Amino acid sequence: MVKRIDPHTHSAYSDGTDTPAQLLAIAAQAGLDTIALTDHDTTIGWDEAADAVADTGVSLIRGAEMSCSSSGITVHLLAYLFDPASPGLVDNFRRTREDRETRAARMVENLSADYPITLDDVLAFAPEGGPVGR
């Protein structure tokens, strides 16, 4: 029997638009057997996704799309089944989140020269615990 798998999905905790539970429901409606939740540099949606497995029948692979840099080159690495409490990963995710927050503040500052917008306006749209992106 052929299994239908999507090994690369994002929820609203990253650059997707659906909650992890909604993502699993959509996967079930699409006839998928398994999805991997691979939000950018976070595992915050894992528990919510795991709670939705019983309701949807879709298997979950826990993962993340990790931002990695070396010698000025940045790549996104898909990683699966790792320990989310690993001190190195926790530190990497924290640094990446801080970098994104700094970048978002700069973007809002630049935009505010021509548009009436504040960082608080932008943060109001971010899911609790989720990232502020472009």
Predicted region positions:
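Extended substrate/RNA-proximal surfaces in nucleic-acid metabolism proteins
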Residues: A52-R134
